[in-house]
From Swiss-Prot:
Residues 30-164 form the Nudix hydrolase domain. Binds 1 Mg(2+) ion per subunit. The magnesium ion binds only when substrate is bound. Binds 1 Mn(2+) ion per subunit. This is Isopentenyl-diphosphate Delta-isomerase. One of its GO terms (biological process) is dimethylallyl diphosphate biosynthetic process. Pathway: Isoprenoid biosynthesis; dimethylallyl diphosphate biosynthesis; dimethylallyl diphosphate from isopentenyl diphosphate: step 1/1. Gene3D superfamilies: Nucleoside Triphosphate Pyrophosphohydrolase. The keyword Heme does not apply.
Length: 181
């Protein structure tokens, strides 16, 4: 895969440049564009992934299915499809926004900051997973309600963005409705 960049955003969330992805994530990460996607299988189960230990931010924590950064001149939807293929080796369908205006800032235990405008989507996995071990060290298909209970009981075991996204009542309801259709 070619070197990835993040699209930097100004105070009005408008693109203001790019920066190499690894260089962007520091103790003082600038605001940038990202995405988060929750994948469901045909049985309505949610794919929860555990981030590789080689990840710069939040290594080894459990998180939603796939996250990433749209590249310059790439739509968020195109970026989600690209990252699903790269991280999970999976094709998707029925890509649906569930929390289009999500943004957050969080600092991991090593001091690395995430500072993102991060629209959240749900999608349906349509092929068998072929996980990239450089991105994902473990994964599990689980019932959404079971994952929600785990998020409430042990939020420290999950990425902060996953906890924040699921804690939004409207987003949680949209995810629940998505997995039941």
């Amino acid at each position: 895969m070619t070197e990835e960049h993040v699209v930097l955003l100004d105070e009005q969330d408008k693109p203001s440049g790019t920066l190499e992805k690894y260089a962007a994530h520091t103790l003082n990460t600038p605001l940038h564009l990202a995405f988060s996607c929750w994948l469901f299988n045909e049985d309505g189960q949610l794919l929860v992934t555990r981030r590789s230990l080689s990840k710069k931010a939040w290594p080894g924590v459990w998180t939603n299915s796939v996250c990433g950064h749209p590249q310059q001149d790439e739509t968020t939807e195109e970026a989600i499809i690209r990252r699903c293929r790269f991280e999970l080796g999976v094709e998707i369908t029925d890509l649906t926004p569930v929390y289009p205006h999500f943004s957050y800032r969080a600092t991991d235990p090593n001091g690395i900051v995430e500072n993102e405008v991060c629209p959240v989507f749900a999608a349906r996995a349509t092929s068998v997973l072929q996980v990239n071990s450089e991105e994902v060290m473990d994964y599990q298909w689980s019932e959404f309600k079971s994952v929600w209970k785990s998020l409430l009981a042990t939020p420290w075991a999950f990425s902060p963005w996953m906890v924040m996204q699921a804690s939004d009542e409207q987003a949680r309801e949209r995810l629940l409705n998505y997995c039941q259709r």
